[in-house]
UniProtKB/Swiss-Prot annotation:
Disulfide bonds: none annotated. GO terms for cellular component: HslUV protease complex. It is found in: Cytoplasm. The keyword Chaperone applies. ATPase subunit of a proteasome-like degradation complex; this subunit has chaperone activity. The binding of ATP and its subsequent hydrolysis by HslU are essential for unfolding of protein substrates subsequently hydrolyzed by HslV. HslU recognizes the N-terminal part of its protein substrates and unfolds these before they are guided to HslV for hydrolysis. ATP binds at V18, G60, V61, G62, K63, T64, E65, D259, E324, R396. This is ATP-dependent protease ATPase subunit HslU. InterPro entries: AAA+_ATPase, ATP-dep_Clp_protease_ClpX, ATPase_AAA_core, Clp_ATPase_C, HslU, P-loop_NTPase. GO terms for molecular function: ATP binding; ATP hydrolysis activity; peptidase activity; proteasome-activating activity. Keywords: ATP-binding, Chaperone, Cytoplasm, Nucleotide-binding, Stress response. One of its GO terms (biological process) is protein unfolding. Belongs to the ClpX chaperone family. HslU subfamily. A double ring-shaped homohexamer of HslV is capped on each side by a ring-shaped HslU homohexamer. The assembly of the HslU/HslV complex is dependent on binding of ATP.
């Protein structure tokens, strides 16, 4: 669980997402409240439930990006899923309880990796000893303990010399035959949608077949060390403890980001068979409110899992959701459409902005891209104009505009004489001016 303050979380999000202060503030407070709850004494702690968030805003303004960045900051079990993947129980498709099962699987994987990393030093020592045993097999006869200790001392000296060479990488390319755990039997099982848990159990049965067997492999010492280190680290990790900690982390600190919630809202003007849209909403109700989900790792309570939902709601409204589900998301945040100034910031001020990405890509072929301020401004204006004239797809429009702008440069990169390209307003107008002015062309090309 992260111990960052709301200000620090917002500051971190600012490096990647432009504007949307209200949304950033809401998720930062929600994330900090996870830590605050953990500091409260036990009787009251159980009564403090998370306040779920609904983010409303047009496409391409940063809703999903906030989720992606939040996943890295949370340091807690986190899953991002699309509401459109699920169907009502009884229909063909995935039911909503698989959200929690997937969250548990991800948490266990994350906890196991962390536990193996903590055991890395001990595992490396054990792997080193196994390699040395292969390089210098010890011959111990029946009178080993009665023999002169000089031979043992000589062996130890030789072993230390080889250990030094091994650590300095002098033996990396030498090939050795090592005994490693044989891979478990992999079986691809195709099951009807909604029966993922049964499939996992059957696959687990197949994987246990042949477990513990050894297999001889010829590898370079560098590869063998890595393989043996992973094997030794896995031996040192207590799987039961990992599963127990992961389940506890999911129940107490889990976060589910539910994207595209608007797509399962039933629009008032729609009639006919509305296949399971309302059914999915009804199935989500107990999950969001707090229920117990059966998984292969035991029963998981969802009472303290934080749900953050988002949707564009351009064809439907939040009020089109069933009232019970609306009540489960007490905090509502509206995200703003992007302005020309926002587009400029996206192109220049974020940590991995598009201009830097294209500069780095073309630099690999010796082409130096230089973006001038008026060129950036013109790019932002064109992206904004096309959004206004056609469909508003937010910051995603910049990808289309940038690709079209640098199409020829990307194609000709590597040619003799093409080593520097200046992107100013004149260059942007030459490449994109006509397309932006012609609404029919921009509708299909930009």
């Amino acid at each position: 669980m992260t111990t960052m303050t709301p200000q620090e979380i917002v500051s971190e999000l600012d490096k990647h997402i432009v504007g949307q202060k209200n949304a950033k503030k809401a998720v930062a407070i929600a994330l900090r409240n996870r830590w605050r709850r953990s500091q409260v004494a036990e009787p009251l702690r159980q009564e403090i439930t998370p306040k779920n968030i609904l983010m409303i805003g047009p496409t391409g303004v940063g809703k999903t990006e906030i989720a992606r960045r939040l996943a890295r900051l949370a340091n807690a079990p986190f899953i991002k899923i699309e509401a459109t993947k699920f169907t009502e129980v009884g229909y063909v498709g995935r039911d909503v309880e698989t959200i929690i099962r997937d969250l548990v699987e991800m948490a266990i994987k994350s906890h196991r990796e962390r536990a193996m990393k903590a055991m890395r030093a001990r595992a490396e020592d054990a792997a080193e000893e196994r390699i040395l045993d292969v390089l210098l097999p010890t011959v111990r006869g029946p009178n080993f303990f009665a023999e002169n200790s000089e031979s043992t001392a000589a062996e130890n000296t030789t072993r230390q010399k080889f250990r030094k060479k091994l650590r300095e990488g002098e033996l990396d390319d030498k090939e050795v035959d090592i005994e490693v755990a044989a891979p478990s039997l992999q079986a691809e099982i195709f099951a009807p949608p909604g029966m993922e848990e049964l499939t996992q159990q059957i696959q687990g049965m197949f994987q246990s077949v042949g477990g513990g067997k050894k297999k001889s492999r010829k590898l370079s010492i560098k590869e063998a060390l890595k393989l043996l280190t992973d094997e030794e680290a896995a031996k040192l990790v207590n799987d039961d403890d990992v599963k127990q900690e992961a389940v506890k982390a999911v129940e107490q600190n889990g976060i589910v980001f539910l994207d595209e919630l608007d797509k399962i809202a039933s629009r008032s003007e729609m009639h006919g068979a509305d296949v399971s849209r309302q059914g999915v909403q009804r199935d989500l109700l107990p999950l969001v409110e707090g229920t117990t989900v059966s998984t292969k790792y035991g029963m998981i309570k969802t009472d303290h899992i934080l749900f953050i939902a988002s949707g564009a709601f351009h064809l439907s409204k939040p009020s089109d959701l069933i009232p019970e589900l609306q009540g489960r998301f007490p905090i509502r945040v509206e995200l703003d459409s992007l302005s020309v100034a926002d587009f400029e910031c996206i192109l220049t001020q974020t940590d991995a902005c598009l201009t830097r990405q294209y500069q780095a890509l073309l630099e690999t072929e010796g082409v130096q891209l230089e973006f001038v301020e008026d060129g950036i401004r013109r790019l932002a204006e064109i992206a904004f104009q096309v959004n206004e004239k056609t469909e508003n797809i937010g910051a995603r429009r910049l990808h289309t505009v940038m690709e079209k702008l640098l199409e020829e440069v990307s194609f000709d990169a590597g040619k003799v004489g093409l080593d520097k390209v200046l992107i100013d307003a004149a260059y942007v107008n030459t490449k994109l001016g006509e397309l932006a002015a012609d609404e029919d062309l921009s509708r299909y090309v930009l």
